[in-house]
C-alpha cells in the first residue's frame, strides 16, 4: 500500500509539463535524504552513488532544482470522477459544496458552481451533450411529484353543490319529461282540492309520490256501507298518499282522469285507509311531493312536432307552409309544359285532295300509291329545308300544280273539299 502511494506521488505532473521524481521518505531513525538528487546518475555502486550525492564531482553539470509545493500522501484521498450530486440520498438539497480542484495550479475557491458550467443546453438553446446547469437527478423530483397529490387540498373535498329543490317550486336541475314539485297545505285547507288545482295549471300529467302531516277530517270510499263512503273525524297522521291525474279529451272537452288513495294512523295506533272520496282536511301543515310529467302519447306527438320544427328551421322553411306546385315553365295540368315543351313541334300533314265526283277514268291502285309516296317525299324535303320562308311556298305551289295535272281538276275545287 505504501509503495502504491509512493509511486503516485512520484508521478505528480508539474505546471511545466515535467514529472517530479521524489524518492520515498526514509523510515524513522535514518537521516533525511537530499532534496536535490543528481539528475544524471551514473551506474555505480551504492557507496559511490551516496558519495556522489553528498559531494558531486566537478565534471558533472550543476544540479537543477525546482521549488514547488508537494502534497503529503496522508492528504491524498481517492477522488470520485464526475459532477457532484445536487441532492443527498435522502432527497434533501446539498447546500454546501466543497469539491477539490483537479490540479494544484487551479486556485482553491469556495464558489464552485460559478466557475463550473454545464455542457448541456438550457431552454431555447442549441444542442448539448447533457443536462443544463441546475438540473439535478430525476429521482427526487419523481418522489416529490408522487407526493404532491397528498398536499392538494382539493383532492379530499367532496362536491357539495348538489341541486336541491326549493320550498314550493321545482328542482334546479330536472329532466324535461319529469319535474318534482313540493306542495304545502296549511291547516284547515283541503289537500285534495290543492292537488287538483295544481294539476289544472298545465297540460302535463301529475303523480303523487308521498305526503306527511296531520289530518282532521277524511272521507274514504267504502263499498260495504250505505252510500259507499265513510267519514272519519279526529287526529290522524298520514302514512302514505299516492295517486295520479292524467289529462284526457273526449268529445272536445278536456278533463282529468285519476284518483288518490291514503293510509292513516289513529292515536291508538290502528291503521286504516282507502280511496279518497271527499274531504281531506289538514289539521296542520301538510307537505305533498308531486311529480309532473308528459304522457306517453302526448310526449311522442310533441317530440314529432319539435323534430319537424327543427327540420323546418334548418331548411329555412316558415312554420306555416302551403303546398306549392313546382312548375317548369307551364301549368301543372300540361305534362309537356313541365319539361319545357311550351312550343310543341307540329308536323302538318300534306294537303289531301279528294278526286272529283265525276271523272272520265278510274284511278288504279298503282297511281294512288305513287301519289302518296310522292307527297310524303316532298313533305319530308320540306321539313328539312334550310330556308323555311320562300322555299316552302314554292314547294307548296309545285305540289298543288302536280295534283291538278294528275287528277285533271282545278285548284279552287281542290281547296273546297275538306281534308
UniProtKB/Swiss-Prot annotation:
Tissue: Predominantly expressed in the stele of the root meristem with a specificity to the procambium.
Low complexity: bias regions: 136-148
GO cellular component, one term: nucleus
Polar residues compositional bias, start-end: 101-112, 318-328
Annotated ranges, domain PPC: 174-314
Record-linked PROSITE patterns: PPC
DNA-binding region boundaries: 78-90
BP GO annotations: xylem and phloem pattern formation; xylem development
UniProt keyword terms in alphabetical order: DNA-binding, Nucleus, Transcription, Transcription regulation
Example of a GO MF term: minor groove of adenine-thymine-rich DNA binding
Segments of skewed composition (Basic residues): 115-130
A family per Pfam: PCC
Composition skew (Acidic residues), residue ranges: 391-406
Location of the motif Bipartite nuclear localization signal: 78-86
InterPro entries listed in its UniProt record: AHL, PPC_dom
Phenotypic effect of disruption: Misspecification of tissue boundaries between the xylem and procambium.
Residue ranges of the region described as Disordered: 1-168, 301-337, 382-419
Signal peptide start and end residues: none
Domain of life: Eukaryota
Subcellular location: Nucleus
Domain notes: The PPC domain mediates interactions between AHL proteins.
Purpose: Transcription factor that specifically binds AT-rich DNA sequences related to the nuclear matrix attachment regions (MARs). Acts redundantly with AHL3 to regulate the formation of tissue boundary between the xylem and procambium in the root meristem. Cell-to-cell movement of AHL4 from the procambium to the xylem is critical for its function in root vascular patterning.
Quaternary structure and partners: Homodimer. Interacts with AHL3.
Protein name: AT-hook motif nuclear-localized protein 4
Protein encoded by which gene: AHL4
